[in-house]
């Protein structure tokens, strides 16, 4: 999974006209406070003073639907970020927004203030799932906004939420292919988390959600990571960021503080199982890079335990000359 550096500011629910089934931005972002321009200036200055050059990092406005907030507030935040862009500073500005909050006027404004990347919260490309979860837009809105952003020269990012109410595994695989057809540069994959006070929480109480198991979602995410790699699309996040407010408000769903590592560990398990089947012996000896040892073994040694249940003893040795993606 690709590493991606951002200095993120969260704008909780300020711009969104909808209340989706899963959404409580205050809990997700860990804040109820919408930042003021002065805070943007101070935080960016402190980050530059502390870190020196940040040419590989971006200033990001996440958490809400940025282009749906009042234009004056958008401009105030973007203006506050301008002095911190350029050589030896941040490489650009990244925002997230809804697919139906993108039009020609929005693109012109973003260009004028040096926004370089726009992420669309697609969540699903199944119209039925979008309706059931009160998204307020359809899959065509994602395709249209994606095409507009690419044509205007923005780096396109898309976001998928796995395991929404009413979604099947086939819906997830179909969504992934349709998202890749939009030709994004980056993708974020968020297994759904049920937060207190949301419609999903009510569905849980009624016993009609969730429908997919933890293992199904984990296996899907592993497949998705492989498929994105094949397509040349960088997956820059797997799973929600771990915050105290998220843990406090979480009732159910597919959450782990290191979900990306779980997914990568599942991919290593598949490699190990194939190697064990190919060699046909009761003991499997592998070498791996030092930084990937924990992923090869799995959380709490789960990969080793699973192989043991299949009659294979796993022995792992570190080798600094091996690439991180290989065993």
State what each model feature region is:
Residues 1-29, 41, 46-67, 96-98, ...:
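N-terminal pre-triad scaffold of radical SAM enzymes
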Residues 52-56, 87-90, 280-281:
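Short helix-terminating capping/connector loops at secondary-structure junctions
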